[in-house]
Design a protein with these regions (language model features):
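Domain-scale signature associated with acetyltransferase and cell-envelope carbohydrate enzymes
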Residues: 1-213, 219-221, 230, 243-248, ...
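Cys/His-rich Zn2+-coordinating "finger/knuckle" modules used by eukaryotic regulatory proteins
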Residues: 235
Length: 422
């Protein structure tokens, strides 16, 4: 009879509806979606969520997690902690990312990245491997990151490309380092090199969350590698091409003079400075790794999935180090040995790169005892940092500065000419 449908005897539904439901429940990850819903995860439109078979549902919290329509979740190392929300603005894809508590990724793509408690990114995010966003670090819409480390509270505007950089500074969500909209960190040279990682602030002071914020004005950029002190203010529309070593400086760089001459490839006129800045960056990575292993560990490991998140952060730091060493190795391969110093670098390439492994040093015992007691009492990490007195802050900075200095020393042992750069 026209307009009628056969009824499925088992479900008492029209057969075409029953068949469509069957196809939907055959979607990849359907069983995982069902398991997540059963344990309390909010998934408003389950049939639109794609979860690969290697995702472990036991690493996704049941408390306050929301996965909006169209999201894709991939990777055996993926962790989603309580209160985290995916895809509130547009679909979000995450692959092997570790999310702390109350993370909001509103739309885009993230892979092999770590987001600590309260970190957030707006729609259009493109966060690639080696990125570590610490507590409440955030970006608005259409932000591209790779091998980027943002300290707590750092805020990025919209339409930003900020790869191969570490940004520290600031004390709170109302007193934070900021990158203005339409900012670019230029990290690729005409010679095809990426020995361009820039350090805004530093680790030995930055971890204490008591330094003036850094402001990089919108519609501007930085030509890596550059380094700045805390409290640096770079005006909107400016392109930073030189270091700002002193703290608290207002910078409005002049436009470079016009040039029209033949290109000289692989000249590396500032080779020693480029090498030194990369070594300093590696030294700060070493200092941050020591901080995570000896201090952060005390607070992370007590949390749900904290061990996995700590491992992810250490993976990011290892990835950042490997990237910097790889890029240095490729640059040295192109250096012409036309001076004694360059000949020494070329001849000692392997020894130099081997000297760039992680530097370390023991934390002050009294500081570790204080942090351990705070963690045992349930004090949050950010609150514990605020309790340090002046002596303890001095000792933390001295400890981490010594690690940076050790990185300098071991590198200069293989290339003595570099010692003058530090």
């Amino acid at each position: 009879m026209s307009g009628t449908h056969r009824v499925d005897a088992d479900t008492l539904e029209p057969a075409h509806i029953s068949a469509r439901k069957g196809r939907l429940m055959d979607n990849r990850g359907a069983a995982t979606v069902e398991a997540l819903i059963a344990k309390g995860v909010e998934i408003p439109n389950p049939s639109t969520v794609d979860i690969t078979d290697d995702v472990n549902p036991d690493l996704i919290s049941a408390e306050g997690v929301v996965i909006h329509p169209g999201c894709r979740i991939r990777g055996s190392r993926t962790v989603i902690s309580s209160g985290s929300i995916l895809g509130a603005e547009t679909p979000m894809t995450i692959e092997n990312c570790r999310l702390g508590r109350d993370v909001e990724l509103k739309g885009g793509f993230a892979q092999d990245a770590v987001f600590l408690d309260g970190a957030s990114m707006g729609s259009g995010a493109h966060v690639r491997s080696g990125c570590l966003l610490e507590e409440q670090a955030n970006g608005a819409h259409t932000v591209g990151l790779k091998q980027t480390i943002l300290f707590p509270f750092v805020t990025l505007g919209s339409l930003i490309n900020f790869c191969d950089a570490m940004l520290t500074g600031g004390t709170s969500r109302s007193d934070h380092s900021e990158v203005g909209s339409s900012y670019i960190h230029f990290n690729f040279t005409p010679d095809g090199d990426k020995t361009t990682a820039s350090l805004f602030g530093d680790v030995p002071r930055g971890v204490l969350l008591d330094q003036p914020p850094i402001f990089l004005g919108g519609q501007g950029g930085a030509v890596g590698p550059v380094m700045t002190g805390f409290g640096t203010v770079v005006g909107a529309g400016a392109v930073l091409r030189a270091d700002v070593p002193d703290d608290g400086m207002l910078v409005l760089p002049e436009a470079p003079a016009g040039v029209n001459r033949p290109v000289e490839t692989a000249s590396y006129r500032k080779l020693a400075a480029v090498l030194a800045k990369n070594i300093t960056y590696l030294g700060n990575l070493s200092a941050l790794e020591s901080w995570y292993r000896q201090v952060r560990r005390l607070f992370l490991t007590r949390l749900e999935y904290g061990d996995a998140i700590l491992a992810g952060a250490l993976d990011c730091l290892a990835s950042a180090r490997a990237e910097r060493i790889k890029r240095l190795g490729r640059l040295i391969e192109k250096v012409r040995p036309d001076t004694p110093e360059r000949q020494e670098l070329v001849d000692n390439r392997a020894e130099f790169l081997a000297a760039l492994t992680v530097a370390d040093g023991p934390a002050p015992a009294h500081v570790i005892r204080k942090f351990g007691a705070a963690s045992g009492d349930g004090v949050e990490y950010l609150d514990a940092i605020a309790t340090l007195n002046d002596e303890e802050r001095h000792d933390v900075t001295a400890w981490l500065s010594a690690i940076v200095a050790e990185q300098h020393r071991t590198a200069a042992q293989t290339i003595p000419a570099l010692s003058a750069q530090f």
